[in-house]
Amino acid sequence: PCPILRIEFERERVWQISAIKPTGLHTLSDPQEDAFAQALDKFSKKLWRKPRQRRKFRFDLAMLADANDPMPPSNKRALKRFVDAGAELGIEVDTISKNDYTKLAEYDGLFIRETTALDNHTYRFANKAEKEDMVVIDDPSSILKCTNKIYLHDLMKARKLPTPKTEILYRDEPKRLAELPDLLGFPLVLKIPDGSFSRGIVKVENVERLKAAADDLFQHTALVLAQEFMFTEFDWRVGVLNREPLYACKYYMSRGHWQIYNHNAKGAAKSGGFETMPVREAPSDVIKLALRATAAIGDGLYGVDLKQSSDRLAVIEVNDNPSIDAGIEDAYLGEDLYRRIMDEFLKRMERKRLGLRS
């Protein structure tokens, strides 16, 4: 640092700087010392950059979402409500994309609102967040258990939970395919292990269609799940958060179709209707079975699909990263649905900060 410089000028038609030399305080005259003291005092009080705003948020939460996803788990209004609910609780919710992987460790938690899969960035994000000791929903273990239908079926079977009759088909065992009609009857349903939103699922009515559909699916996977077909007008969807029921919906089949989503339809016919109700108004056996199913997965956020036919109740699947759309799943709870989820993040992040185990 050189607080005092002596600048010498010379004039040859115009004034020019001829020298710049550092000098000491002892070289100044009394008037110069007074001028220097005033300048130094003014400089010391000057702000060279704006002060940081006082922190309004206690925690920072990254919400992973894809604006270009044609079937996202949450629509734009729902994402905005998550941000607003977080702010109410002192959580700053930043929407991030797959390009923000290197910035993930800057946050206290990760909330995945993108369709998850083991072979894409969502699983990598979840893994990194867990290794950084962040609060993360969906956690890697839940993604692993839920996104593979064969793994999930074996898990439900081990827990002795009711499911549709199921057989596993292997690409190199054609004999097992030939036995299916006797084992499951027709119609039956074929599923690829990692399908979502009614994709990768085929209903077959006869032997010829069975063989053709299996041949097609085996082009993409070595294993196929075959299940008996349970027709119902709607599926139950029970949202579960930290082992407690959060919401209950009926998802009706797409018009003239056997699934909730009809990917060959256009417009309103693409998905069926819905009915959202208080958890207390849903059948108690539906809620209890949903909780038993998620107990095998973990303590995160899940959506359990169940079918109820006369006196029979069966778990179809447990979804990590369940749909939470404004106007559908929040139709009963409204803003409170988003607050409850953000409050769960808050509790977990507080425990992390205090060094307490979950």
Labelled PLM ranges:
Residues 2-8, 95-98, 227, 299-310:
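A short glycine-rich, hydrophobically flanked beta-strand micro-motif that places a catalytic Asp/Glu
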Residues 281, 295-299, 308-358:
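C-terminal active-site "lid" helix and adjoining low-complexity regulatory extension at the edge
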Residues 1, 11-165:
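Conserved N-proximal alpha/beta basic substrate-recognition cap immediately N-terminal to
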Residues 15-22, 107-112, 238-241, 306, ...:
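A short beta-strand motif that forms the metal-chelation/ATP-contact edge
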